[in-house]
Design a protein with these regions (language model features):
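Non-catalytic architectural context of zinc metalloproteases
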Residues: 1-30, 57-63, 92, 158-171, ...
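Auxiliary, metal-adjacent structural segments of Zn-dependent hydrolase domains
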Residues: 8-88, 113, 131-144
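A generic secondary-structure signal for well-formed alpha-helical elements
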Residues: 50, 103-107, 195, 199
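Zinc-dependent metalloendopeptidases
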Residues: 73-74, 79, 106, 119-124, ...
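Short alpha-helical catalytic segment bearing the HExxH-like zincin motif
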Residues: 90-98
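Catalytic Zn2+-binding segment of zinc metalloproteases
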Residues: 99-119
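Low-complexity, serine/threonine/proline-enriched polar segments
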Residues: 117, 121-165
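Pan-zinc metallopeptidase signature
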Residues: 150-220
Length: 220
């Protein structure tokens, strides 16, 4: 499929571009610099079948992102990206993460159907619980074995414990603290590590997750 990005330079308010069948819209002024070609290169990392659910990447000041303290979110065929972030590396990282969430729509059975990924995730949660207890942190077992997203647990990880402190605790267990949030975030965090960071550490610590990503590539 033909790509239509021909402009060079940074994304600006009012831009409406198309690349690899994805419409890129800049709704509001960006408080960071993002080169158009850098964004195009990230999109081109993926086989077309992996990005087929994404019709739009929209940059702007979105209430629903701000209220939930999200930098980006995938919803109904679009990736919404906050216009207020620290830099383009973080923005591109977030976009790849949300592409990971979009993949669940088409490949949910491949990723989750056999239950192997969920078992790997729960096992890691239990290992993390051991590390928490060493630090005097107690979380009810029913929360730690629940693979679904729990906003209270998310906030406890990010705000009460804090990701800087959690980073040391998850070493050798999760790729990053955010991967411990829920099963779906575990997958998207690994997707981001595999495609964007190209980090072989993921294969070492999360063999089931890595094998799912390899299988995904083979089927895309």
């Amino acid at each position: 499929m033909q790509n239509y990005i021909t402009n060079k330079g940074e994304l600006k308010k009012g831009n409406f571009l198309t690349h690899s069948a994805i419409n890129i819209v800049v709704k509001d002024h960006l408080l960071f610099d993002l080169d158009i070609e850098d964004l195009a290169r990230v999109i081109d990392i993926f086989p077309k079948d992996i990005t087929r659910n994404i019709d739009y990447i929209i940059f702007g000041n979105f209430d629903f992102l701000r209220k939930q303290n999200y930098n980006a979110a995938y919803k109904d065929g679009a990736i919404y990206v906050s216009n207020n972030q620290e830099g383009n590396h973080d923005v591109l990282d977030d976009i790849v993460h949300e592409i990971g969430h979009s993949v669940e729509d088409n490949y949910g059975d491949l990723v989750y159907g056999d239950g192997f990924l969920e078992r790997e995730f729960i096992k890691k949660r239990m290992l993390l619980d051991v590390e928490f207890r060493k630090e005097g942190i107690t979380i009810p077992k029913e929360k730690m074995i629940n693979p679904e997203y729990d906003q209270n647990l998310d906030l406890f990880f990010s705000q009460e414990i804090g990701y800087p402190r959690m980073t040391a605790m998850v070493q050798g267990i999760f790729y990053s603290p955010y991967g411990a949030t829920s099963l779906k975030e575990y997958f998207a965090n690994g997707f981001e590590a595999h495609y964007y960071h190209k980090d072989i550490y993921l294969q070492k610590i999360s063999p089931v997750l890595h094998s799912k990503l390899v299988e995904l590539e083979e089927n895309a």
